[in-house]
Amino acid sequence: MMIDIRRLAFSALVCIALPITAVSEEQNDSGRLLTADDLLALKSVGGPEISPDREWIAYTIDTIDVEADDSSTQIYMVSRDGKDVVQLTSDDYSANSPKWSPDGRYLGFIAAKGEDDDAKSQVWLLDRRGGDAKQYTSVDQGIRGFDWSPDSKKMLLMITDKSAAELAEEAAEEAGEEAKPLPYVIDRLQFKQDGVPYLDRSRTHIYVWNSDDESLQQLTFGDYEDGQATWRPDGSEIAFTSNRTDEPDSNENSDIWVVSAEGDAPVRDPRRITSNPGSDSSPTWSNDGRRIAYITVTEPELIWYATNHLAIASAAGGDERVLTAALDRNISAPLFTPDDQSILFSLEDSAEQHLGRYDLNTGAIDRPVEGNLSIGRFAQHSSGDVALQISLPHLPTELFYLGSDQLTQITKTNDETLHDLDLAEVRNIAFKSADGTTVEGFIFTPPDYRKGRKYPTILRIHGGPVSQFDFSFNADAQLLAAQGYVVVISNPRGSSGYGQDFSAALFANWGVPDFEDVMAAVDYAIAEGYSDPDRLGVGGWSYGGILTNYVITKTDRFEGAITGASEVNYIANYGHDHYQLQWEKELGLPWEDKEAWEKISPWENIDKVVTPTLVMGGKEDWNVPIQNSEQLYQVLKRRGIETQLVVYPEESHGISRPSFRKDRWDRYVAWYDKHVMGQ
């Protein structure tokens, strides 16, 4: 069974299964233009989880409350045919990670629910026979994740050790004293991570909660981080991912391990399943419990440029085999099919994200869902049916159901927001870079686009660098197109989806082939008659901002630039961001290989910038620290280049507060309108 979205007309989604150029023709030609407020009104769909009786799919909806300047997540369920939708959790608290008990009686989820503002995340249960959610766990520091045992009587919990501050606060409370703040005491090689305080020795371990006697038993120990835990189908063991080398902070050598879930032994020695020196992750058991499929990186020296392959090993350990080496595309989220004859997975390929399937008997790979789309998370029922997330150029993520050779859209979460909007037409393009390399991309044209007219054009660059623009809904590009811009996006070298060599072309070579590729995208848009060469803008976030910095230090063709959460002076990031291991592998140590660090740093050509540049970032960003933006701003301001620095308080690498997200979109439009549109 193979379903290609390019040839299929979905039930419940009329005409959206046509090629991308035809999809655009189905848009509302008399609608209104998209605004930042519309983007905030869009709801994010998460999940799915299929009920054991196959009748319902649980999922989450994240909704923004503009007035409260916050967002919340609720759990819903939708019938398999999409006709009935039921909200399961109330709007007064956020809930996530819904999981059905295997016996079908309960739906578990995680929520920090309670009258106390400091309530910790716990597992709560909804009884399918009715009633309010009831708290199931009570862990002082809260839980990070959970999974039902196959017999529904136990629950695997991921719990992080209490921090020094939490222990001190407890001690003060017991003594009837007020807790005093403690200094951060750091002794780890890797001591930063975006979105969290300084890293200490608190580690996440595996516990099992037994509902019969309400006991909590710890299964894994030590100065190691454990994650991605999953039950063996007979409930006797748990597979998990952990880096248990002598110094986990100095490498990315995570392996698959298995620990017994039976008996009363206080300390258990996990069994090592994989021995690959690279990262092994995402373990999943075969239904007979004899094998474990997982994701492996076989060339760890290439860090994030290496391809993620599908692999399999004996559950007893050994017999490790890489299954998709010849495919040369990134694989994720493996799941055995019910008959154990195949493995499903998510497959990234050339601006598309497909549902792939590997036949364990023949080695053949097919794609049950493919085409001009981007799938997200998926879940499989014991019948073989699959529920999955899909996004399209004019469709933010919704849930679809694949059963009986029929792919059906079962949620329409954002129809009300989208129905009267006139969105940009999106065209898939391919062009040659300066050295003849073929590069793929997309062009978004304004809803009132007229062929023959040359439009002001914005080059938007994706983050990563190892990621890709795909056929999913692109909020930034749609918003700018609604303002009258042609928007050009591309997947330059360094991007994923085109093979390891394409990604690794950027290794220690930032700002060289990728610069040529994005400039070729602009030249293509000009040559095809879309773009006015005298009204060009450029911008991006994260690596998109970094490549923007290369662009403005190498060319004066752009009238305005926006660089968000970017780096500019690389050597200043040593010991400051959370990429210390990756920096060292790619560029060496700065006191030993100073030239390598300086060679690719935009800082070395910062005196050549003449483009008016808006600089943005989050104050608490430890992924790409705000000091980079501050240094860039300082240079531009000192040199008399028109610039502005916008810093969002209490924000890390991604901007989450709704008012800040709207502010960022508004500033994008205002800056480009002034410098590119000429208003």
Language model features with spans:
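Mature N-terminal segment immediately following signal peptide/propeptide cleavage
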Residues: 28-63, 67-69
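Conserved beta-propeller blade repeats
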Residues: 42-58, 92-110, 133, 138-155, ...
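Short, solvent-exposed loop/turn segments at conserved positions within beta-propeller repeat blades
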Residues: 67-72, 115-120, 197-202, 248-254, ...
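Predominantly five- to eight-bladed beta-propeller fold
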Residues: 72-73, 160-209, 254, 307-310, ...
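Short loop/turn segments that connect beta-strands within beta-propeller blades
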Residues: 79-83, 127-131, 210-214, 260-265, ...
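Cap/lid segment of the alpha/beta-hydrolase catalytic domain
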Residues: 245-246, 299-300, 413-534, 541, ...
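Active-site-proximal cap/loop segments of hydrolase catalytic domains
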Residues: 489-679
